[in-house]
Curated annotation (Swiss-Prot):
Region span, Amphipathic helix 2: 56-63
Region (Amphipathic helix 6): 172-179
Lipidation (N-palmitoyl cysteine): C25
Amphipathic helix 5 as annotated region, ranges: 155-162
Signal peptide: 1-24
Lipid-substituted positions (S-diacylglycerol cysteine): C25
Annotated region described as Amphipathic helix 3, given as residue ranges: 69-77
Protein name per UniProt: Outer membrane protein TP0453
Keywords, comma-separated and alphabetical: Cell outer membrane, Lipoprotein, Membrane, Palmitate, Signal
Residues covered by region (Amphipathic helix 7): 194-202
Species per Swiss-Prot/TrEMBL record: Treponema pallidum (strain Nichols)
Length: 287
């Protein structure tokens, strides 16, 4: 009887200890409100909003050949939506993920033996650096990731924008998709140099089209994506040739509204879309 009571006490003490450990770990979590786009920052060449549900196959294809594929997948598996920015000059992606993360066990997940170096910001937020990728989980409901070249921004700088957000100015529809809070599965992209992206979509990567900013919205449908694209036209003298070229290559409804070329009901395979998106940050695509 005494032994049973002792065993019960030790088991209870163990449970309480673990609970206290977990509580003490989460007590230091970031509790203030967070602006995802303000954290990734302004001045990017590409912005994206990526709900994970319904788009898992596309995400797997995009990160398939990345050096930090396994580490990125750890984060994605716990993510409901990604807010991202790509910076061509420094060849880096900054990602803010909303979801459910193992905040209390980051030291076990991102261990020194696996090549991670642990550091803290002036606000006491822990982050982990490796050769290609830097990660921080400031709270159980969001994470921050930077991956890219050695010129990429330091994670401490990104985390400083939790306090002082640097929010980019983005189109109304893009903003609307970002605030859908998981109710939409639409992938949204805003690209500063629309000509660079559209030539890859047309499969004419060497063609230099004088085009402005582009908005792209994609919805998964079986193994392909249905998309709507809005492209700012540049030189009025060549607008018609550009419209003609695009209409000959893309199977979609195309028309002009003011200074914008609108492409609706276009389709693209998940494999092709992943290739085009990946080319935006690949060494070849971002040189």
């Amino acid at each position: 009887m005494i032994r049973r009571r002792y065993r019960g006490c030790t088991q209870g003490a163990w449970i309480v200890s673990v609970g206290m450990l977990f509580a003490s770990c989460t007590s230091g979590a970031w509790k203030a409100s967070v602006d995802p786009l303000g954290v990734v920052g302004s001045g990017a060449d590409v912005y994206l909003y990526f709900p994970v549900a319904g788009n898992e196959n596309l995400i797997s294809r995009i990160i398939e050949n990345h050096e930090s594929k396994a580490d990125i997948k750890k984060i994605v598996d716990r993510t409901t939506a990604v807010y991202g920015a790509f910076f061509a000059r420094s060849k880096e992606f900054r990602l803010f993920g909303s979801g459910s993360y193992p905040y209390a066990f980051t030291n076990l997940i991102f261990s020194r033996s696996d090549g991670w170096a642990s550091t803290k910001t002036e606000h006491g937020i822990t982050y982990y650096e490796s050769e290609h990728t830097d990660v921080s989980i400031p709270a159980p409901h969001f994470s921050c990731v930077i991956f890219g070249s050695s010129k990429r921004e330091r994670m401490s700088k990104m985390l400083s924008r939790l306090v002082n957000p640097d929010r980019p100015q983005l189109p109304p529809r893009f903003e609307k998709e970002c605030t859908s809070e998981g109710t939409s599965q639409t992938v949204a992209l805003y690209i500063k140099n629309g000509g660079h992206f559209i030539t890859k979509l047309l499969n004419f990567p060497q063609l230099n089209l004088p085009l402005g900013a582009m908005e792209l919205y994609l919805t998964a449908r079986r193994n392909e994506y249905l998309y709507t694209l809005s492209l700012q036209l540049g030189n009025a003298k060549i607008n018609f040739p550009i419209q003609f070229l695009i209409s000959r290559v893309l199977n979609a409804h195309i028309h002009v509204e003011g200074d914008r070329l609108i492409i609706e009901d276009g389709t693209i395979s998940a494999e092709r879309l992943a290739s085009v998106i990946s080319s935006l940050y690949s060494k070849k695509g971002s040189s």
